[in-house]
A protein has these predicted regions:
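Contiguous, non-catalytic segments that form substrate-binding/exosite surfaces or channel walls
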Residues: 56-184
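Long, amphipathic alpha-helical stalk/connector segments used for oligomerization, subunit docking
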Residues: 245-324
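Short active-site segment of divalent metal-dependent hydrolases/proteases
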Residues: 201, 205-209
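N-terminal helix-rich structural modules
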Residues: 1-93
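Short pre-active-site segment immediately N-terminal to the catalytic Zn-binding motif
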Residues: 180-200
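C-terminal, non-catalytic "cap/extension" segments appended to globular domains
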Residues: 73-88, 108-111, 293-390
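Post-HExxH zinc-binding segment in Zn-dependent metallohydrolases
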Residues: 223-257, 264-267, 335, 368
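Post-HEXXH active-site segment of zinc metalloproteases
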Residues: 194-198, 210-238
Length: 390
């Protein structure tokens, strides 16, 4: 449906431009952002072409490399320490909705209808029909994303996602290049038709979010927003979920829309489950490692430290042996959760956009109408209405 660009010369151009601009780094934050952006683009380019694009002399710029790494480590520690300080609030916030939400979802997954959806599979959608569906949705719900879609098609800026371990479980990703103030969108090949449409909306919504943020702040701060905010996935899921609802209201591939939406909600439940575990994980262990931790190790560490507080016996052999990360658990919990909460309330969403930067702050969330009680009520009502119909 969308021809993915496998010519990565544009990435090479961006890499060279960042190398030329290394001397512009005049602060620790700029060094961190330049280094992180540079390493991401280099990694993608190398995975895609098996060629190292780095200028060795430039790559050894000590200020950018060492100050950038040092600052990134500092930002990471701040993010982890803030999570540890507010872990009880995360635990209370997520648990207020998690159990009832997961019960509703699991009941639907156990139904005959979901079994029918699963066995039916995804429909084949022609290129023309797919484009018509997208443009109709853009016109009605998010015209700015539609303009981005036209631009990315015209400039051939939908790149094929190479095999990068960091993104191995994702169908797409968006990298914000603060130096050129541009976004690069990567999509996996062979994504099924309706899933591809929703994926395009998700990733281009990231682009719109970055552009909107950059219009009100510096490019460096825009990158920092993407690095540290627990809410950077909310705008993407907000538009993606509205797309599913648009399909349902207009009776467009209803079964496929429900199946794809449910798959995203299952991912959200898994992320919330991981976030609840991290909120009980020993602080010292989390400070040492917050990325790619075996889930079994997290559970066992919790059981060792809090055995007397947990009356239920757990068998770690029942846990799928997968690696989990704190940042992903946070972002992919609040992203779908807040999208579900606000998708019928544009005024609330606009208020949320004003506070989406920075760290988790339950007082700010409550002030605009996103207290844990309000989120719980809206998500459960939305879930019951949705699953009650289908």
């Amino acid at each position: 449906m969308i021809t993915l660009n496998t010519n990565y010369d544009e990435l090479y151009r961006q890499i060279k431009n960042i190398e030329d601009r290394f001397l512009d780094c005049n602060s620790l934050n700029s060094a961190a952002v330049y280094y992180a952006t540079y390493q991401s683009l280099v990694d993608f380019y190398f995975r895609a072409t098996l060629q190292n694009p780095c200028n060795k002399k430039v790559n050894h710029n000590k200020f950018v490399k060492y100050s950038g790494i040092q600052r990134l480590n500092t930002l990471s520690k701040k993010r982890i320490n803030h999570f540890i300080e507010s872990r009880k609030k995360h635990l209370s916030y997520i648990s207020s909705v998690f159990f009832e939400f997961s019960d509703i979802l699991n009941e639907f997954i156990d139904s005959d209808y979901y079994e029918y959806l699963y066995s039916k599979g995804m429909p084949n959608i022609s290129v023309d029909e797919g484009f018509n569906i997208l443009y109709s949705f853009f016109d009605e719900c998010c015209p700015k994303v539609g303009e981005l879609f036209d631009k990315f098609l015209e400039e051939d800026k939908f790149f094929m996602l190479p095999e990068v371990s960091l993104y191995s479980n994702r169908d797409g990703c968006t990298i914000y290049n603060s130096v050129d103030n541009v976004c690069d969108v990567f999509l996996k090949p062979n994504v099924r038709s309706l899933e591809l449409l929703s994926l395009v909306i998700h990733e281009l919504s990231h682009v719109e979010d970055m552009q909107s943020y950059a219009s009100q702040s510096s490019s460096i701060n825009t990158s920092l927003y993407q690095m540290r905010s627990p809410f950077c996935e909310v705008p993407a899921f907000y538009n993606q979920f509205r797309f599913y609802e648009y399909l349902l209201k207009n009776d467009i591939y209803k079964d496929a829309a429900i199946a794809d939406w449910v798959n995203n909600l299952v991912m959200s439940i898994e992320s919330m489950d991981n976030l609840l575990l991290f909120s009980m994980y020993p602080s010292k262990k989390l400070q040492k490692q917050s990325v790619c931790i075996p889930k079994c190790d997290v559970l066992n560490a919790i059981l060792e430290e809090r055995a007397e507080d947990i009356p239920i016996e757990f068998d770690s052999t029942d846990i799928i042996d997968e690696n989990i990360s704190l940042d992903d658990s946070v972002q992919y919990s609040y992203g779908p959760l807040f999208a579900m909460t606000m998708m019928d309330d544009e005024q609330l969403y606009n208020k949320f956009l004003m506070i989406r930067d920075g760290y988790f702050d339950s007082d700010k969330l409550s002030y605009i109408g996103l207290s844990s009680d309000e989120v719980q009520q809206k998500v459960i009502k939305k879930s019951q209405d949705f699953f009650g119909k289908y």
